[in-house]
Amino acid sequence: MSERTKWTDEQWEAITGNEKSLLVSAAAGAGKTAVLVERIIRKITDEENPVDIDRLLVVTFTNAAATEMRERIAQAISEKLEENPGSANIQRQLTLLGKACITTIHSFCLEVIRSNFQQINIDPGFRIADETESRLMKLEALDEVFEEQYENENEDFFELLECYGGNRDDRALQDMVLNLYDFIQSSPWPEEWLEKMTESMNIPDGTDFGKTLWGSVLLSSVKIELEGLKEMISRALEILKDASGLEKYRAVYMEDLANVDALLKLLNEESEMQWDRIFNALQGFEFATLPRCGREVDKDKQEIVKKIRDDVKQRIRKFREKVITSVSNEIISDLKALYPKMKCLANLVKQLAEKYAEKKNRKSVVDFNDLEHFCLEILTERKEDGSIIPSRTAISYRERFAEILVDEYQDSNLVQETIINMISKGDDASPGVFMVGDVKQSIYRFRQARPELFLEKYNTYLPDKGSPCRKIILSRNFRSRREVIDAVNFLFKQIMSTGAGELDYTDAEALNFGAVFDENAKEDITVGGEVEFHLIQTEDEDKNFTFENEGEEGRQADEGEEDEEMLDSIQCEARLVGRRILELMKPDENGRYFSVFDKAKNEYRRVEYRDVVILLRTTRNWAEVFVDELSVMGIPVFADTGTGFFKTVEVQVMLSLLQIIDNPLQDIPLLSVLRSPIVGFTTDELAELRLVDKKALLFDALKKLAESGQGEAAGKASAFLENLQKWREMSLYMSTDRLLWQLYNDTGYYSIVGAMPAGEQRQANLRILYERARQFEETSYKGLFNFINFIDKLKSSRGDMGSAKILSENDNVVRIMSIHKSKGLEFPVVIVAGCGKKFNLQDMNKSILLHHELGFGPDVVDHKLRLSWPSVAKQAIREKIKAETLSEEMRILYVALTRAREKLVITGAVKNVRKAVEKWLDSASVQKSRLSAYDMLSGANYLDWIGPALLRHKNCGGLRDCVGSAGFRGLLIDDPSVWSVKIWNKTDVQSSGVSEEQGESEFIKWLDSLEKEEPSEYAEETARRLSWSYPYVKASKVPAKVSVTELKRRYNEVVSEDVMQFPDYMPVLVKKPMFLEEKKGLTYAEKGTILHFVMQHLDYGREDIEAQIEEMVAKDLLTPQQAQSVDAARIRRFLNSPLGKRMLASKSINREVPFNIEIPCHELYRDMEDEACHGETLLLQGVVDCYFEEPDGIVLVDYKTDYVAPGNVETIRERYKVQILYYARALEMLTGKKVKEKYIYLFWDGRILGF
C-alpha cells in the first residue's frame, strides 16, 4: 500500500494542507490523532523544506494525551529512520524530539512564565500550589474579606447579605463569591469582565429592553417556542381535516394560528420599542371559546386537538407571567435597583482576588489559573486606546514556531484561545494554526469550555482548497460496525440542530462507515446485529395512575417516596442489563455464541465480560446499585465512581483515630476506634464502658474503666490509652504522613484490613490516604489539626475522592463508568443505561446565575417582606443556560453512542409506557425530517429524544402500537438502521431474581417444618459418644491445602533455603507497603513480586514497555518507587530471546494462572503411617507464571529474579525441579493437553534452563 492510498481524500487534505488557518472537524472514530501525527511527520521529514520538530507547538488537552502523542511521533520517526537509515535530517529530528513542545496549554504557559518571570515581577523560584493548598488559601482570604466588611459596617455589604446570605449565616454569600471568582477565571481579563457586566445593569432610561443582550435572548427563546406552537396548531388542523363532527373547531384553530403568526411577525420586524409592542400583543392575545359540537363526533380526535390547544394556552400564559412580564421602563427600574448589590458583589470578588494573590506571593506559589493569566500578561500589551496587541515576547514566539497544532480544539476556553492568537495571528510570516476536534463531542462546559469558539470558525471557514481560513470535515468512522453508524445517524439527523445541539447534523456531519470487519464470519457465531432499545415500565400494570404531570402543577411526592421510586427504577434497569449481559455470554437458541472481532489476532472470538461497558450519565446513586445487582447475578463488575473514598470503613476508622489523637474528647470518633479491630471492644464491653459513668465524656469513662483494672475491657482500655498518649506526643513533632505510617505499623490495621473481604482494595485505600497526607505536608499547611480540618472541608464541599484503582485492563470484568470518563475510548459492547434519568438543571435555581456573555442574573429580593422572584435578566440567563445545557446533554449522548464498536444497547425506564409514548407521539407527529428544536429543548431526559425519533422509524411499529398506530401522523422514515425495540414491565424484569415475597414464603415454610426439640433420654449413649477418641489424630494435623512452594521446601531439605537469595513469590500488594518497613528500598522478594505483576499486565502487542509501566503508575497499580525497580531492558531481552519470540508467535498466551489440584497425601508426608494417609488427598495450590500453546502441545515458562552465581546454575535447576514438575502436572490436568517443554527463565542474566 502506498503512502497516499492508506488515507481517505479528506484525511490526506488535512495532512498536506498548507492553509494559514486550518480547522479539521473530525467525527468520532475518524482517526484524528493519526492524521495529526502524520501531518507532523510529513513536515519534519519533508525532503525539500523540512521543519525541525522543536519549531512545532503541539497543544493537547491532557498530560496523558501529550505523552501518547510524543510516543507515537517517536515511533513514526523511528520507522522513517529504518526506511532511510542514512538520513541526517531524520536522525536530527529524533535528537530534537526531547525538547519538542508537545504539551498541554498549562505546561506551555509554565515554560513561558519561567523564561520571562522578570516581566511580571514574580519569584523565579515559584512552585505550583497543590489544589488542597490553593483552596485553603482561598478560604482564608475569603474569611479575611468578610471580617473586614463586618468591621467596617459596610451598608451595601449588609444589604447584599440580607438578600443573598441565607437564613442562619453568611455561608451562602461566601459560596456565591467563591463561585463568581472561579467563574471569571476563564475570562482573559477577569476584573474587566466584572466591571463590564456590573455596569451593564445600569441601563439608561428609555432603552428598549429588547435591544439589550437579555432582551434579545428572551425574544429569540419566545420565537423558537412560538414556531413550536405554530407547528402544534398546524398538527391540530391536520387532524381536524377528517375528524367527523368537529368542523366548527377549524375556524377557532385558524384564528389561533393567525394570532401566533402575528406575534412571530412582530418578532421578525425591526421596530422602535419592540419589546413593549410584543408585551402589549401578548396581553391582548385571546383564545376564543370552542363551539359546541353534536353527539356524533370522533371523541379520540376531539381529545387530541383539545389537549394540543390546552398546551398552547399554557405556553402563552408562561410568556405573559414568566418571560415578557412588563414593559421596558419597569424592567430597567428593577435592574437599576439590583445594580448596587451586584457592584458590591463584584467588589467582594476583587478583594478576594487581591488577598488571595498576596498570600500566593508571600509563599511564592501560583495556581493553574495563574499560569494562563500570567502567560497572557507576558504575551500581551495594551495600546493607549485600550486595545490588546502582541508583546515583543509574543512576537519572538511567532518567530520561533513554524506551526501551532491544537488537539481537542472544541474544549478550549477564551483564555487559551487568546494565548494561541497572540503567538499565531499576524502577517504572512506568522505561524499557521492547525486545529482539530469535534464540536459534537464538546462536553466540558462545566470546566468553562467554549464550543462556540469552534462553531464560529466552523460556520465561517470555507471548504475550498487554498482558502486562508479553511475547514475540512473527516466523517468516515473507522471504529464501529455499520449497524452502530446507521443508528447514530438516524437519531442525530432528527434531534440535533442549531437550536438544540448548536449544530445542524446534516449529511456532511453524519458518520460514514469506514471500519474493516471480517464479514465472512463463521456460521457457528453471531456478530454485530441490530441496535437494541429496551424500555422498562416501573409502575405496576394494575396501578391506578392518579398523576403523571411532573411539572410545577403536578402532585409532589414526598422526598422519601421519590428516593424509593428512583431506587426501584435503577434496580429494575440493572437487572435487565444484567440479564442481557448473561444472554450475550451464553449460546443462543441455535447454539451460536455472540463474538467480537479481535484486532490483535485478526479473528473473531467469543465475547468476554471485559468487552462490555455500561455507560451512565452519572455514577452517583446508580453505579452502586448496578454493582450490587450484577454481582448477585454472578457477573464480575467494577465501577469507577470517583467518589466513596471517605465512606469506606478503613478510611473512616483511620480518620477517626487521627481525630482523637488531635482531640480525644470526641465521643463519635472515639467510639468508632474502640469498636474497630484496633481496640476490639465488643458491644457488651461498650455497654460496660458507658455504665462506668453515664454522664461523662466517653474518654473520661474510658480512663475510669482503665483505672478499675477489672476484666478484659479494662485491659483493652489501659493498653489503648497508653498507645494514644504515645501517638499524641508523636503528633507534636511528626508530620501527618509519618504519623499515619506509624499508626499502620503500631496497630497492624493495614494487615488486618488486608485479610478482610476485598482486602486488596482496602489496603490500596489506606495507601491513598497516606499519599494524600504526604501531599498535604508538602504544602505550606502542615500538622495534624490542619490536615483534619482540610479533610472536613473537603467532605463538606462534596469533594470526595474515588476509591483506589486496583483494576487492570486485562481483568475480565464488566466496567461501569460515566459517559465523560469514556470519552476517547472504545468498547466492543456498549450499554448506555439510565436514559430515563432527568437532566440535572438544578444550577438554574441558584439565587444568582452567571453567564459569560450575559453577566449577572440575580433574583429580585424584598428582604423586608421576605419575598424573592427572578429578575428578567435571570430569566434570560436561565433560558440561555438551559439551551446550552441541553445542547451539551445532546453531545454527551452522541459521545456515549459512538463508543460502541460492535454492539450497542440502549436502556431506560419510565413510570408508564403508554403515557410516555403518547408524549413522544406529540413530538414525532411532524412532516419534517428533523424534529423541532422546541420539542427537543422541552425534553426531560434522553428518552424524550430517542423515543420520538424511533416512533418515526418504519420498522419500529411495536413502539407505535403502544398507543395505536392510527394515532401517529408524523413522517415515517425508511432508514437503513436496524433496531430491536423491546418493552418490559416490572414483573418481567424482577423475575430474573428471587422476589422478596418468595424469600419470605420459603423462610416461613422452613420455620414451620422445624420440630420442637425434646430432651434426650439417652444420657449414657450421649456420654459414650462424647468420650470417643478420633483414631486418625496424626492425620488430622496434615493440612488440607498446601502450596507448591511448601512442596519445594520439603523436597530440598539437603539444601538450606536462603530467603534473601531465593525469595518466595507473593501476590502483588498483599504485603505491607514499603513505607511500613523498617528499612529503605525494596527487598528482593518485593522486586520479584513487582516484576511478576508487570509481566502479568503488560500488553505484549505494544513495544513501549516503559510507557506501559508509567501507565500502571498513573492508575495507582504501582508506586513510582516500585516502577523504578523494574528493568524494562531485561523484559525486552526476554521477549527478544528465542523462547520469548516463540511465546509472542503463539495465538494463546496465558499468564499468572492459578490452580488447585488434588495429590495423594503420602507424596508429601512419606513418614506418615500407611493407615493414616490411606485414601487421603491434599489440595495443592499454586500459580503458573506463564504458558503458551503450540500445535503439538504446551510450553511452560517460569520466571526467576534470583541472583545466580556463575557455578550455581545446576543448583537452581535442582532446587526448582519439583515445583516445575508439579506446575506441568497441574497444567495437563487443567487443559487436557500435554506439556511438551518446561523452562525457567532467569531475568538476572537471561539464561534459559530446560527440564
Swiss-Prot record:
The keyword Acetylation does not apply. The gene is addA. One of its GO terms (molecular function) is ATP binding. Its EC number is 3.1.-.-, 5.6.2.4. Residues 5-481 form the UvrD-like helicase ATP-binding domain. It comes from Acetivibrio thermocellus (strain ATCC 27405 / DSM 1237 / JCM 9322 / NBRC 103400 / NCIMB 10682 / NRRL B-4536 / VPI 7372) (Clostridium thermocellum). GO terms for biological process: double-strand break repair via homologous recombination. Keywords: ATP-binding, DNA damage, DNA repair, DNA-binding, Exonuclease, Helicase, Hydrolase, Isomerase, Nuclease, Nucleotide-binding. This is ATP-dependent helicase/nuclease subunit A. ATP binds at A26, A27, A28, G29, A30, G31, K32, T33. The keyword Transmembrane does not apply. Pfam families: PDDEXK_1, UvrD-helicase, UvrD_C. Residues 526-824 form the UvrD-like helicase C-terminal domain. Heterodimer of AddA and AddB/RexB. One of its GO terms (cellular component) is cytosol. It catalyses: Couples ATP hydrolysis with the unwinding of duplex DNA by translocating in the 3'-5' direction; ATP + H2O = ADP + phosphate + H(+). Residues 544-565 are annotated as: Disordered. InterPro entries: AddA, DNA_helicase_UvrD-like_C, DNA_helicase_UvrD/REP, P-loop_NTPase, PDDEXK-like_dom_sf, PDDEXK_AddAB-type, Restrct_endonuc-II-like, UvrD-like_ATP-bd. Its cofactor is Mg(2+). PANTHER family: ATP-DEPENDENT HELICASE_NUCLEASE SUBUNIT A, UVRD / RECB / PCRA DNA HELICASE FAMILY MEMBER. It comes from the Bacteria. PROSITE patterns: UVRD_HELICASE_ATP_BIND, UVRD_HELICASE_CTER.
